[in-house]
Design a protein with these regions (language model features):
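N-terminal secretory signal peptides that target proteins for export/translocation
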Residues: 1-10
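Bacterial N-terminal signal peptides
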Residues: 16-24
Length: 425
């Protein structure tokens, strides 16, 4: 079922007005004495390039050691098997990056490449749309891998052209969008299927994910209004996805289309598709049948990413703290917050949740948080559509991204690119 609210946002660019307000709200000096809007024990006061990389302050010593081990794995470059250090071999055969931090730089937000440059923190999903089903491309699978280990062919290369678009507000303020056009070159295994669509995705920030995991299903679902029954002009729906471990249908929370129901699935799926790392969840290599040399290449075994490593990565990503709100008592900030609410931004970017009980971390349980998201899907219109459905998300629907930490992107990641493909700036 299609939603309508975000299409209205795109045509009447409330979406970009809301982002402008959030950028204003997130600038300025910290005022910790006045800080009361989000629990201090799950947030950190940092305005450096490490602002997204700190653990929540209330971790005990044992979990802090595991967090440090997880951070080491997150930043460590994997190598081709067999390697001198077996615990980090198994890269590829085809892949996009050789480390988690290669895409999620400083645990922050990725960006599209500059003209003529290779992808660094962006990937391209593939989906063959046939008879109302979403299938892998027969030659290239569900993601295009633009790199490969020695002796193996990469799958293809991406060329991006940008066409700058200006939008002028009624007050004459100008915002810029770069409309991207994608072309896949140097395909190694023949053309894409005629029904295959491509979807560009920049890497999202990874802090605060454990807190999102701790929000109860009921608290997310209660904001859904797919048919706009309350007549406020805003509609949104939640995504229901298949959990590959339990085989049950669960609420989607993570990813640009809310296509992952848990951080575990997000981690092992990304390790397999982005880096070519097998695990007990994905024991096979990420090679399609036509890629014979890829399938026959030497591997690091069926669990190149071990269960112990997965647990450390999971704890690391669950316990990354969110940046503390800044300048909360400033007059302009307060006025910006009032405007943010009055023009309807909070209809989708809901400011406040209280987490439920987290299954593994009491430190994340029953905390007041300020993510500025409803975690629902909204129709963002044909200009932002990728035509790639994901579970119950349609091609023109995207999950509302959390806006916490927005004002620190320029400090941490040295850019201000926004949206799923980084076209807004």
């Amino acid at each position: 079922m299609k939603t309508t609210s975000s299409k209205k946002f795109f045509k009447k660019p409330v979406f970009f007005i809301c982002l402008s307000f959030l950028l204003l709200l997130s600038h300025g000096n910290s005022n910790e004495q006045e800080f009361s809007k989000m629990d201090i024990e799950i947030s950190v006061k940092k305005e450096t390039r490490e602002a997204f990389s700190a653990p929540i302050p209330n971790l005990d010593l044992k979990k802090m050691r595991l967090f440090t081990g997880g951070r080491h794995l997150f930043r460590r470059a994997w190598v081709t098997a067999p390697g001198s250090v077996q615990s980090i071999d198994g890269l590829g055969p085809v892949f996009n990056r050789n480390s988690c931090s290669g895409c999620h730089v400083k645990d922050g937000r990725g960006k599209p490449p500059e003209r003529g440059k290779e992808l660094k923190s962006m990937v391209f999903k593939l989906a063959k749309i046939e008879d109302n089903s979403v299938l892998p491309d027969p030659n290239y699978g569900i993601q295009l891998n633009d790199k490969a280990i020695l002796g193996i062919q990469y799958e293809g290369k991406i060329e991006i052209q940008y066409f700058d678009q200006e939008f002028v507000y009624q007050d004459k303020e100008i915002i810029n969008l770069s409309k991207p056009v994608y072309k896949i070159n140097k395909l190694s295994f023949g053309p894409l299927d005629k029904n295959t669509k491509i979807s560009a995705r920049v890497a999202p920030a990874v802090f605060g994910l454990g807190l999102i995991e701790a929000i109860t299903e009921e608290d997310i679902k209660k904001h859904a209004d797919p048919d706009d029954e309350n007549k406020d002009g805003i509609s949104g729906k939640y995504n229901i996805v298949l959990d590959p471990q339990s085989k049950l249908k669960v609420l989607g929370r993570f990813g640009w289309k809310a296509s992952k129901g848990s951080l575990l699935n997000q981690i092992v799926g990304a390790a397999h598709e982005d880096m070519g790392l097998s695990s007990k969840y994905f024991p096979e290599q990420n090679c399609m049948t036509i890629q014979k040399k890829c399938a026959d290449s030497i591997t690091g075994g069926t669990s190149e990413l071990t269960e112990k490593q997965i647990k450390r990565l999971l704890l690391y990503m669950q316990t990354l703290a969110v940046p503390r709100q800044r300048n909360t008592q400033d007059k302009d900030t307060r006025r910006g917050e009032e405007l943010f609410k009055s023009i309807g931004c909070e209809s989708c970017h809901i400011s406040t949740f209280v987490t439920g009980k987290h299954e593994n971390h009491e430190e994340l349980s029953f905390k007041k948080i300020k993510p500025y998201s409803d975690f629902l899907l909204h129709d963002m219109g044909k200009n932002l559509a990728d035509e790639v459905p994901s579970a119950e998300a349609e091609g023109n629907e995207w999950r509302t991204p959390p806006l916490w930490g927005l004002g620190l992107i320029k400090i941490v990641n040295k850019h201000t690119r926004l949206l799923h493909d980084g076209r807004a700036k």
